[in-house]
Amino acid sequence: MRPSDVYPEGAEFGFELLVCRWAEAAWPPDGGSDGDAVIVARQLGTKRRRWDTVVVECDPAGLAARARFGDRELDSDLLHVVRHAPAEWAWYRDALPHPGYPWRYVRAAVHRAAGRGVVEKRRRNNRIEIRRVAPYPDWVRRIVAVENKPDLDASAARALSDQLARDVDTALADEVWVATAATGGRVEPALLEDVPVEVGILAFAFDADAPGDAWADATVEWHPSDVTPADAESDEERTTTRLELAERAYGAGWRSYHDTMRPDCRHFELRRYGRALVPHCAAKGGPQTAAECAGSCPDFEPEPPVWRTGGWPVEGGPGKGIQSLLRDRREWVRRREYPETGDADAGEN
């Protein structure tokens, strides 16, 4: 399979998935590592800015401790409860800092948190008291943002330049990169475009037939600057926003693209590309984007029930096989990142 079979004519979706899979297995780009674990997510950000790929560099022990709170994201309301829950029983209004909005919303978050088992709750003297199940760990070390532009020509660079400059100025991410497809020239065209000097440039060459890790060759064409502000430690708003972002990455990962596609279509397939599994449409005879893979697609056909029959009644539902496979891959990666789980099979994806 050629790269053009995954991201034809510079299409970003397939390129983005390959970059995510590479980052999951090989981050950081320079090959050096401080022993960080990594979580990779895609299409993640804030109300004002969304990044193509987000890499969360984590403390391995902290990431393992984060697992105590489950596999799902803790949203901002739950984080407010879990981070400040006391070691001993206390009325929730005494235990938690004022949120800046009515306490009834905090009370609802307390009930949700207790329902998920991330805090303990009891009623005493007609008051709701809470107690933590474990200290919420300091598990996030750095957040890296990556913009994926397989065809970074002059017009694409101009459109992206202002966004990258804002990323550098706001410094919500500690490091910003642009990922592009390698051309094989002596000087990659991306180096000649209008990209802020603080932004790193990664050039990728993918080869599905190459053995092992050689399927993805990432070359650092320009090293980024660390844009972490000097007062980062004392900036509580920045810390909270980054933690919310990291929690969304933890809950979603990058394989959640099936949530915006139609894996319940009989034409939806996953095909191996190197060490990645990428979507493929049998009706089109090639890759599909999330926008194309929708119920409005003229080639959409429901998955035949016989495909998921294991006796009677039918097990699961339409598209559950695809979703289960992607979920299993994600859980394998999570186990690999936890220090107490031991070695994992390098052939997984």
Residue ranges and their predicted role:
Residues 27-47:
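A short acidic/basic microdomain associated with nuclease active sites
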Residues 155-195:
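Short, charged, amphipathic alpha-helix that recurs within catalytic cores of restriction-modification
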Residues 103-134, 182-349:
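Non-catalytic C-terminal interaction segments of nucleic acid-processing enzymes
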Residues 42-44, 133-136, 165-167, 190-192:
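Short, flexible, glycine/charge-rich loop motifs used to bind or transfer phosphoryl groups or to couple energy/partner
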Residues 1-21:
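A short, highly charged nucleic-acid-interacting micro-segment common to nuclease
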Residues 51, 144, 174, 199, ...:
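Residue-level detector of short, conserved catalytic/binding motifs and their immediate flanks
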Residues 51-160, 177:
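Conserved catalytic cores of phosphodiester-cleaving nucleases, focusing on short active-site segments
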Residues 48, 140-141, 171, 197:
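Structured loop/turn residues at beta-strand edges in well-structured enzyme cores
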